[in-house]
Amino acid sequence: MKKKIFYFSTLFITILCLFICIALNDHIYNFNAENVVKNIKYLSSSSFEGRRSGSEENILTSEIIKNKFKGLKLSPYKNSYTEEFITTCPVKTDETVYFKIFNDNESEYLKYGEDYKEDMINFKSNSFTFSNKDKINIFSTSIAVSNDEGTLLFYLAQNDDLSFRSSFMCELRFDLVIALSSNGYNKIIDALKAGKTLNVYIPFKNEAKKLVNIQGIIEGSDPSLAPLLLTAHFDHLGSDSQNNIYYGALDNASGTSFLLELANTLSTLGKPKRSIIFVALNAEELGLKGSSFFAENNYFDIKNSKVINFDMIGVENCPITFIQGVGFKDNSSNILNSLSNICLNDSVDYLVEYENSSDHASFNELGIDALTICHSDKSHIHTPTDTVDYIDSNAINTVYKVVNKEIKKDCYSTVTTFI
């Protein structure tokens, strides 16, 4: 009799648990790559004008992400959804770009976008007047000018393509950097030889701005376990002097949208064993400023954490690339080993690279086990053609399947997935 009671009790509990799991599973949000694509399209639309750090559009993007975190019921990390920091940003002025070559008898203007175009590297000085009386070094692919106004670098654009725009590097020794076509290069050389004066004005300046990272957390059940960090940067390059927008769909509306969809999914699961921190990082294009601040400001809370950063997700027929910092190459990385094994077991093509090319580097430099997951297709990166048209939902799903297995293994048990 006791055996029958035990048997039926066990059977009842098993069936009850099964029904509970099924009921709870109905409330689990399933990751949807098409929603990621829709959000990429939205964040990389002309309304956001390239999301340049320090711009109104960058602020708008941060507010949208913050409200999304709130809507998903993520808790504020350290009692706040925002982490403020101050850094130097490229700021657009209201003036008109020009490049004038003249002497007492004649003048001409170089054509913006055909002969020359500013690179976004630095704007310590945005106006230069120079001639062959100044210190000028001429090379086959560059011209360096130095006078009382500062230092100016011209460089010859590859294949005369002026569409590429570099990340901002205000620590660079050159105060202004301008890309030239071969025609623009030759016109400058000819003008200097003829003793003419050259005057260029670029409508950007350096300015200190208050920026924010956006942060949220799903609290874990075991505070002794180091949290898992999931990150992506939401800033991009803005627009150039004639308002051509650098949309930044792959770089990195894709990683931001992937992070938001992942947060949507994980927020509907049960309580994880370890806490999961979501951070939408700012100012990656200014030299990893947002991630550097977050890593240093929160070091003692995350020093034993693993960090997965998403940067450029969604390229068709492109292997997943796991990127770690140059100085981290000789370190043992649990997160790299684990993700690599998942790819091997699931026959997913992947590569491993060591570059300080994204926000993982800020964590690696502090000895924190971090990597970036990336589809490393650079054919449209930092050009106005980086649009949603080149985003592939199947590639997004492939990344999700790999990441999902890692997160479930690291943060959840079979039971806590549902409870």
Where are the model-predicted features located?
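Active-site metal-coordination/substrate-binding segment of hydrolases
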Residues: E108-T141, S146-G150, L225-F258, L262-T268
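Second-shell loop/turn segments in exported
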Residues: N25-F31, S46-E56, E83-T87, R173-D175, ...
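N-terminal hydrophobic or amphipathic helices/low-complexity stretches enriched
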Residues: K4-S75, I218-E219
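His/Asp/Glu-rich mid-to-C-terminal helical/loop segments that flank catalytic regions of hydrolases
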Residues: S379-I419
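Soluble metallo-hydrolase cores and metallopeptidase-like ectodomains found primarily
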Residues: F164-Y246, T268-L269, K273
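Noncatalytic luminal/extracellular "stalk/propeptide" segments of secretory-pathway proteins
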Residues: E49-A144
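Metal-dependent peptidase/peptidase-like ectodomains
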Residues: L281-S379
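Short helix-loop-beta-strand segments that form the rim/entrance of peptidase-like active sites
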Residues: N264-K289
